[in-house]
């Protein structure tokens, strides 16, 4: 309801009063942003439904994981720099190629990075980490920040639809739920916990071996 309110209220002001071009532009820019956010939320809900109904397929192919993780993280360097947050990498060199859908997993990793950016302060560090399991059959991709941590949230509900936690910086409550759905369809796992000392860790795990590469229901 919040995005709709932020769209309808300024539109009503535009309709009810004569405004010059500059005033109209100031009102229309946030309207566009909220409309775009609503479109993104609707797209995520529809994509989850398609996955659940088997109408959307994952395009799973082997990719060099560490190289991919760094390429996704590098897209956020400017945003972290503007906020005064360091972005670092701890990549397990044992990990080579891993089968996954690049586009779907990029959404998941980007969502975790946006959360770190949102809840971290200037002067802190966010770290992208890859880890190979002891059995060498799973890899874990983690985002560790030095933000406010997870004391204000129910970690059991964190990846549930529309859950927003007990903090003031709420979102749509869809992103993490969508991320979980994408990783579950990879036959993987997602999770989150408080980091040692300060901050939070969000992670997802992918199996190193799948029945087939290419398309996986």
What is each stretch, according to the model?
Residues 33-38:
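Short alpha-helical segment of the dimerization/phosphotransfer core of two-component systems
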């Amino acid at each position: 309801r919040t995005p709709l309110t932020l769209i309808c209220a300024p539109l009503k002001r535009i309709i009810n009063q004569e405004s010059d071009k500059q005033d109209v532009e100031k009102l229309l820019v946030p309207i566009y942003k909220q409309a775009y956010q609503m479109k993104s939320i609707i797209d995520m809900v529809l994509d989850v439904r398609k996955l659940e109904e088997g109408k959307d397929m994952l395009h799973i192919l082997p990719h060099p994981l560490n190289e991919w993780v760094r390429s996704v993280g590098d897209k956020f360097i400017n945003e972290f720099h503007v906020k005064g947050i360091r972005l670092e990498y701890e990549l397990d060199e044992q990990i080579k190629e891993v089968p996954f859908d690049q586009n779907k997993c990029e959404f998941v990793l980007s969502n975790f990075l946006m959360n770190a950016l949102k809840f971290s302060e200037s002067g802190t560090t966010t770290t992208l980490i890859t880890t190979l399991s002891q059995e060498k059959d799973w890899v874990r991709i983690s985002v560790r920040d030095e933000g406010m941590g997870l004391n204000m949230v129910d970690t059991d509900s964190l990846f549930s639809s529309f859950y927003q936690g007990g903090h003031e910086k709420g979102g749509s409550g869809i992103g993490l739920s969508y991320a979980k759905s994408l990783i579950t369809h990879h036959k993987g796992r997602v999770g989150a916990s408080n980091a040692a000392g300060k901050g939070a860790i969000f992670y997802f795990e992918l199996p190193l071996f799948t029945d087939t590469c290419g398309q996986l229901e």
